[in-house]
């Protein structure tokens, strides 16, 4: 294996492992986040299932964590065998999977961020009150979980770039092609 291929494979492995860790951390932080307040003898509990966007984030992060863990195993096995390049159909499958994971998680982050802003700031036009003034611990832990999910999403975008490079290098120039000077 060439040095550049080893470095790229190592970078991909580290990114995929970090995706698994950050996505799992986000999942744990969000799912375990609850806070109970007593309002005039009525118990009100804030939990992640109250906002559908956050449920979407939990599902997306669970899928991403498992997918990245499986791809990390594939990277380790490929590195041990010394095989870097794949067949075109397999490279297309990895590229498509990486793209799907990146888009899924970016969409989940965007939806959850909007819900978070509404929970923090409220919406006067719709008479929605600020929830985070009442459930401070809940909102803080949720913000940390969403930040972890954001880091996982950023790593997924970089993995998608590496995956695209690995795919399109299979379509590189051949020796039979004529080059035109510019």
From Swiss-Prot:
Sequence ranges on the Cytoplasmic membrane side? 1-12, 74-89, 163-182
Example GO CC term: the record gives: plasma membrane
Give the main localization category.
Answer: membrane
Q: Where in the cell is it found?
A: Cell membrane
Q: Which residues lie on this side of the membrane: Extracellular?
A: 32-52, 111-141
Q: Which UniProt keywords apply?
A: Cell membrane, Membrane, Transmembrane, Transmembrane helix
Q: Where are the transmembrane segments?
A: 13-31, 53-73, 90-110, 142-162
**What's the protein's topology in the membrane?**
Multi-pass membrane protein
Pfam family for this entry, one:
CASP_dom
UniProt KW Membrane keyword: yes
Q: How does it assemble?
A: Homodimer and heterodimers.
Q: Which family does it belong to?
A: Belongs to the Casparian strip membrane proteins (CASP) family.
The protein here is known as: CASP-like protein 2B1
Native source organism of the sequence: Arabidopsis thaliana (Mouse-ear cress)
Q: What is the lineage of its organism?
A: Eukaryota, Viridiplantae, Streptophyta, Embryophyta, Tracheophyta
